[in-house]
UniProtKB/Swiss-Prot annotation:
Protein's name according to its UniProt entry: Neuropeptide F
Gene Ontology terms: cellular component: extracellular region
Gene source species: Arthurdendyus triangulatus
GO biological process: neuropeptide signaling pathway
Reported function: May perform an important neurotransmitter function and may regulate muscular activity.
Cellular localisation: Secreted
Residues carrying Phenylalanine amide: 36
Family: Belongs to the NPY family.
Length: 36
């Protein structure tokens, strides 16, 4: 599965972006580093 990181500009707030980055980090820990 290929994960595409969304740019900061696609989020309406910095908080949403930070939450997204945390979720990505959890995903990487669970499944290994995805291919971008």
């Amino acid at each position: 599965k290929v994960v595409h990181l969304r740019p900061r500009s696609s989020f309406s707030s910095e908080d949403e972006y930070q939450i997204y980055l945390r979720n990505v980090s959890k995903y990487i820990q669970l499944y290994g580093r995805p291919r971008f």
